[in-house]
Amino acid sequence: MSDYHINIFSSEEDAGYIADIPDLESCSAFGATPEEALAAVNRAKQAWLAAAREEHKPIPPPRYRPAIYQATR
């Protein structure tokens, strides 16, 4: 399976960064730095996929090219 597109953006309200995977509903994570947010969302992705497999739910294919985009402040 190809990898998923990841967005990383700063959150002034949370004083850190949020990363999300648009293809996996509600799969997002927070980190104090972009690198921490990326590591956290990769852990969240693994948990999301494991839960979907365990519950025999469909796993959506990636709709976007695998990339990591970061919005700057």
Per-region residue spans from a language model:
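Short aromatic-glycine-(Arg/Gly/Cys) micro-motifs in beta-strand/loop hairpins
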Residues: 9-24
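Flexible, active-site-adjacent loop/turn segments at secondary-structure boundaries
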Residues: 22, 28, 57
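A short, exposed loop/beta-hairpin motif centered on an aromatic-Gly-Thr core
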Residues: 25-36
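Short, charged, surface-exposed hinge/linker loops at domain edges
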Residues: 1-5, 35, 39-73
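Generic structural detector for well-ordered beta-strands
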Residues: 7-9, 30, 70
